[in-house]
């Protein structure tokens, strides 16, 4: 079955359980330490003890003051188009496309997406996890849980733990910015966080090659081709969306 945990990685029975964390459930289903995978019944095919230091280096901020194993290269930058592709918390897409210039977004009015300004209150997940502190650009507030598991943006919070729990600052003179980073800084203003572990960058990780969600998606796609009105399409799609904290 799909993996459901609270914010500490402790298994819960489902998405309606007290303490359920869509962000942590999704993050741990994708990749983490083997010692933290005991609750993951979703894995079908995987590799143990993968030397993932380079992958984690690419995804970890180059934060001034952190020691080597907790300081990355800020190399794998997510694009704005990738960021725009994530839903809002209400399940709506923030934009419906781009204007003729290919850059200016066309705001989806049903999404409650706000492009300009900064937040005046903390934005937290249903499990109490801080997603966006005060002063975060509004375009990163009120997004779906997977966004906060997959994307590191300026003013986002890095994982708790040794040399963690800090607020990421990608501005030019910020703690993770270009001035102190020399060549190791994000060129897009974002980092990919997906598949990143919460510990140091030299830990060996489980590489999940096939998980139950992939099987569900393959089943959904097959039905869409041969029986597009089959009720299982939305049964399994909504199962996946609910685990991710997205309305069905």
Regions picked out by a protein language model, each given a short descriptive name:
Residues 1-80, 86-248:
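Acidic/polar-rich alpha-helix caps and helix-coil junctions
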């Amino acid at each position: 079955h799909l993996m459901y945990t609270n914010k500490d990685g402790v298994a819960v029975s489902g998405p309606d359980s007290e303490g359920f964390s869509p962000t942590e459930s999704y993050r741990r289903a994708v990749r983490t330490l083997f010692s933290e995978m005991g609750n993951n019944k979703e894995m079908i095919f995987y590799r143990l003890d993968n030397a993932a230091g380079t992958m984690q280096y690419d995804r970890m901020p180059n934060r001034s003051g952190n020691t080597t194993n907790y300081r990355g290269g800020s190399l794998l930058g997510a694009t704005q188009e990738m960021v725009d592709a994530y839903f809002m918390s209400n399940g709506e897409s923030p934009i419906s496309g781009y204007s003729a210039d290919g850059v200016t977004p066309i705001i989806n009015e049903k999404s409650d997406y706000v492009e300009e300004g900064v937040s005046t209150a903390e934005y937290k997940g249903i499990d109490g996890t801080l997603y966006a502190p005060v002063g975060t650009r509004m375009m990163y507030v009120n997004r779906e849980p997977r966004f906060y598991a997959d994307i590191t943006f300026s003013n986002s919070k890095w994982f708790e733990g040794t040399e963690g729990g800090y607020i990421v600052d990608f501005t030019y003179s910020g703690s993770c910015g270009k001035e102190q980073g020399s060549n190791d800084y994000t060129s897009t203003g974002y980092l990919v966080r997906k598949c990143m572990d919460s510990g140091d960058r030299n830990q060996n990780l489980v590489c999940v090659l096939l998980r139950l969600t992939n099987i569900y998606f393959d089943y959904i796609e097959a039905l869409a081709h041969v029986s597009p009105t089959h009720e299982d399409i939305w049964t399994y799609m909504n199962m996946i969306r609910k685990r991710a904290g997205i309305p069905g």
